[in-house]
Regions:
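Glycine-rich phosphate-binding loop of ATP-dependent small-molecule kinases
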Residues: 1-322
């Protein structure tokens, strides 16, 4: 699954400069403690995290003076990019429902839903595909996870998940929304491992469809180029080999003679787990300050592996990779 995801992600990224290239926006919504964060974390581990941007916003009461989606437009992905967006405009929609309670203006609610649908269709028409995933669990599982030591850090909808009345209202509205919009993928969060795989497969299917569509449109726009690539003998200007031999530049000794600090596998895993835990705590205590880690060096020198080990204990909403 990871290999397939990276293959499609690489294809998407390599097509970013093309006329028919597309971006992918993944909207993540649903119940608290239903496995949303775990699923996105697994996705970033199975793919190249450099080309996935993860955003999260808290639900706000929608303004009457601008479209409900207006404040979220800066999180949209560019061509060749993948963006995962927790909360998003649906968190604002749910916030409106709970703020209004029994005095909800059904006409305004319907208008906001129609505005969202029009905006999403406009994104698709302008080469940004959308995958919408709704996570849910039953009440028994929710109650158990709410008493766990590490609950979901993002209270996206500003509601009390310990109150049965709030949970019932949330489920009632989510059922209504699912009935109005058939574009949602329902992710069952009862089994975390299974929901991670289900979510990843939904993303994989979307990437494959996007890449196939881009390739088909490229072939339609450039039939001559397609014919030449299939028949290289027809190329009017074949690439000529360089007559000069390749001469590698001498490297500084410190770059090729790195001092080795080998560890036993058991010691390595123990130290790694301990230091990852300390690092995660320090990062979460930074307050409003930003922390920047800069990696530089030779290809295949371990930069990517080091980055993966640093982000492993973190929530995808806590970091961005450039």
């Amino acid at each position: 699954l990871s290999f397939d995801l990276i293959t499609e992600q690489t294809t998407l990224h390599e097509q970013r400069a093309g006329k028919n290239s597309r971006g992918l926006l993944i909207l993540v919504n649903g119940m608290e403690n239903s496995g949303k964060g775990e699923a996105v974390k697994a996705l970033t581990e199975w793919m190249d995290a450099r080309y996935i941007k993860v955003h999260a916003t808290m639900g706000q009461h929608p303004s009457r003076y601008q479209p409900i989606w207006q404040r979220h437009t800066w999180q949209l992905p560019r061509k060749g990019e993948i963006a995962v967006y927790f909360g998003n405009w649906y968190a604002d929609l749910i916030r409106y429902v709970f703020d209004c309670g029994d005095d909800i203006d059904e006409q305004r609610l319907q208008q906001m839903i129609e505005d969202i649908e029009a905006f999403e269709q406009d994104l698709v028409n302008n080469n940004t595909d959308i995958v919408k995933c709704w996570f849910s669990v039953d009440n028994k599982t929710l109650k158990k996870r709410l008493t766990d030591e590490e609950p979901d850090p993002e209270q996206l909808y500003h509601l009390d998940w310990f109150r049965k009345k709030d949970v019932k209202r949330f489920k009632r509205f989510s059922s209504k929304l699912m009935g109005l919009q058939s574009s949602w993928h329902h992710i069952d969060g009862q089994d975390i491992d299974a929901s991670n795989i289900q979510f990843a497969n939904v993303v994989l299917a979307a990437l494959r469809t996007m890449n196939q569509l881009s390739a088909a449109n490229d072939a339609q726009d450039n039939p001559a180029k397609t014919d030449k690539s299939a028949n290289p003998k027809n190329d009017e200007n074949p690439i000529k080999p360089n007559p000069l031999p390749f001469k590698p530049t001498p490297l500084i000794g410190e770059l090729v003679s790195v001092e080795s600090h080998a560890l036993e596998k058991a010691d390595y895993k123990k130290q790694l787990h301990s230091k990852q835990h300390i690092l995660a705590e320090l990062i979460r205590e930074r307050g409003q300050r930003h922390i920047i880690f800069v990696f530089e060096g030779m290809d295949a020198a371990g930069k990517g592996g080091a980055i993966r080990r640093i982000i492993a204990p973190l929530d995808p909403r806590e970091f961005t990779i450039h």
